């Protein structure tokens, strides 16, 4: 399963990166994140072992919220504009996630992409279940809401000068 979400944000790349990297603050920033527990953190803060809990809105029916929870290792590379996650527990165990931040040469802002890749060790899970249920219904939906909300925060806070 591979899925990508991309959005352009008008704000300083360093500020966008910081908001994305500071996952322990996400529950206060992102209404669909219920909890982030940091189990371990490197002295630099560039590596964290965490448990994250979010909710998928309007699933399985409009108005309902479906809770999801997973463990992950996060590694940040600020100079490269990359944040990596490896899911270590939960329904998407083994999933790799890469956040990429790039300046847009056309002046649309900072291009922020979240890519998810998951291959289950049991092949029968890699078809419809991985693609439609995990990928489309949860991963893509939650990542899209995360990016849209971060964009609102960055641009609402008056962080419009991004160079």
Language model features: what each stretch is:
Residues 1-48:
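Hydrophobic ligand-binding cavity/cleft-lining segments
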Residues 1-6, 49, 69-71, 82, ...:
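Intrinsic-disorder/low-complexity, polar/charged segments enriched in Ser/Thr/Lys/Arg/Asp/Glu/Gln
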Residues 5-7, 36-39, 69-76, 87, ...:
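Hydrophobic/aromatic beta-strand elements that line small-molecule binding cavities or substrate pockets
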Residues 11-13, 54-60, 74-78, 89-93, ...:
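Beta-strand elements of well-folded, non-transmembrane domains
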Residues 12-18, 138, 142, 146:
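Short amphipathic alpha-helical segments
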Residues 15-20, 26, 74, 112-114, ...:
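Hydrophobic pocket/interface hotspot
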Residues 38-89, 144-163:
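Glycine-rich portal/gate segments that line the openings of hydrophobic small-molecule binding cavities
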Residues 84-144, 161-162:
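Beta-strand/loop substructures that line and gate deep hydrophobic ligand-binding cavities in soluble
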């Amino acid at each position: 399963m591979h899925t990508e979400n991309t959005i352009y944000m008008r704000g300083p790349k360093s500020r966008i990166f910081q908001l994305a990297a500071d996952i322990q603050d996400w529950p206060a920033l992102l209404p669909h994140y219920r909890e982030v527990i940091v189990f371990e953190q490197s002295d630099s803060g560039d590596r964290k072992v965490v448990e994250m809990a979010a909710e998928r809105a309007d699933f399985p029916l409009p108005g309902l919220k479906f809770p999801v929870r997973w463990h992950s290792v996060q590694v940040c590379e600020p100079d490269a504009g990359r944040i990596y996650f490896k899911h270590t527990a939960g329904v998407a165990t083994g999933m790799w996630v890469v956040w990429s931040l790039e300046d847009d040469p056309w002046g649309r802002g900072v291009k922020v992409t979240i890519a998810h890749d998951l291959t289950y060790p049991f092949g029968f899970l890699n078809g419809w279940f991985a693609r439609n249920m995990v990928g489309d219904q949860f991963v893509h939906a939650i990542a899209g809401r995360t990016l849209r909300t971060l964009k609102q925060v960055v641009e609402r806070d008056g962080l419009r000068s991004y160079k």
